[in-house]
């Protein structure tokens, strides 16, 4: 019985030390959304989506970032859950600054690790995007980011 206890304690200690090291690495590599600079990504997305035209329209998507009514509703649901009184309107999609605010709000909730790839693909294909279906869009945005 004593040997089993020693083995279990050893396994537990090993697990805790690996877990602790992993947490330290994550805290070093990950920057919170409020500190992460999404501006280059947003500007590249704007160029791909609308070439910077705030009056751009394509189906239900409008504005520089081609925001849909569903995304506006999701942003308002997030704000409601956060007990914020702020709400977005459908006309806010035509505002460059409010479009960027909605993008940042979505990243803060659905992309807490600030993955640029996830942000780009989710903007094109939704939160449950298909890598295959978003590949061309991802490459377009990344090519602009590399310039």
Model-derived regions: residue spans:
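Bacterial N-terminal signal peptides that target proteins for export
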Residues: 1-8
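Bacterial N-terminal signal peptides
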Residues: 9-17
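Catalytic glycan-binding domains that act on GlcNAc-containing polysaccharides
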Residues: 24-147
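Sec/Tat signal peptide C-region and signal peptidase I cleavage site
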Residues: 19-23
């Amino acid at each position: 019985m004593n040997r089993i206890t020693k083995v279990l304690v050893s396994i537990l200690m090993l697990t805790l030390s690996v877990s602790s090291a992993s947490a330290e690495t994550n805290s070093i590599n990950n920057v919170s959304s409020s500190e992460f600079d999404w501006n280059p990504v947003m500007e590249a997305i704007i160029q791909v989506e609308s070439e910077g035209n705030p009056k751009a329209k394509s189906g239900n998507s409008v504005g520089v970032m081609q925001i849909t009514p569903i995304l506006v509703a999701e942003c308002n649901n997030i704000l409601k859950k956060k007990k914020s009184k702020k709400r977005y309107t459908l006309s806010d999609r035509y505002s460059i600054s409010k479009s960027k605010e909605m993008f940042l709000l979505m990243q803060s909730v659905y992309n807490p690790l600030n993955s640029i790839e996830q942000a780009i693909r989710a903007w094109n294909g939704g939160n449950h995007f298909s890598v295959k279906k978003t590949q061309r869009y991802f490459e377009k945005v990344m090519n602009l980011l590399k310039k």
